[in-house]
């Protein structure tokens, strides 16, 4: 079977399969997995996130249609019942540990951008994430709308977000920005 590097394969290159598998063993809970691995779950969830899939059935059909690409990523299609069971029973700490491992790698590998500022420069931004009012009644921000805000403090020298917070949709960007602990003398834009 001929192999072609896909954009998704290139996106996954910073994630070492060996590191992922060792973290998966550390964060495993319950019986041994028979029909699917945590790598299959990760690939399936990543592909579904990037292709805006909205249901388990949609994820399953997308993965089945991409079998040849999954093969080259070392994964196989995963049934919706298996994916639901893995999402429910296996702890999320695997992905949290993988995130922090990638973040530490990114902070050491990144080249510093030169600025004329003597002090560190940070960009503060917030994005509203719309939610369904029926499913998330706790996130009500208007009579017919529910949302949360994702606040990010980006270090412009390393281009890595150093501060992240989630708040209700009504909260001002400045209120959350004042709660971030920026280094003394920083310039915040």
Regions found by a protein language model. Give the residues of each.
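Conserved, well-structured functional cores that handle cations and Mg-NTP chemistry
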Residues: 1-189
């Amino acid at each position: 079977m001929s192999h072609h590097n896909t954009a998704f394969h290139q996106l996954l290159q910073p994630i070492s399969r060996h590191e992922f598998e060792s973290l998966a063993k550390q964060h495993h809970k319950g019986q041994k997995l028979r029909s699917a691995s945590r790598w299959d779950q990760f690939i399936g969830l990543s592909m579904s996130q990037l292709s805006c899939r909205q249901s388990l059935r949609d994820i399953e059909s997308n993965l089945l249609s991409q079998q040849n690409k999954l093969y080259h990523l070392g994964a196989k299609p995963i049934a919706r019942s298996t994916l639901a069971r893995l999402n429910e029973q296996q702890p999320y700490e695997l992905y949290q540990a993988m995130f922090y491992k990638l973040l530490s790698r990114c902070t050491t590998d990144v080249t510093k951008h030169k600025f004329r500022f003597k002090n560190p420069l940070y960009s503060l931004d917030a994005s509203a994430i719309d939610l369904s009012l029926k499913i998330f009644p706790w996130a009500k921000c208007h009579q017919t709308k529910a949302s949360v805000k994702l606040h990010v403090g980006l270090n412009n020298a390393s281009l890595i977000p150093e501060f992240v917070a989630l708040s209700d949709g009504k909260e001002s960007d400045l209120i959350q920005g004042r709660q971030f602990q920026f280094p003394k003398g920083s310039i915040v834009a």
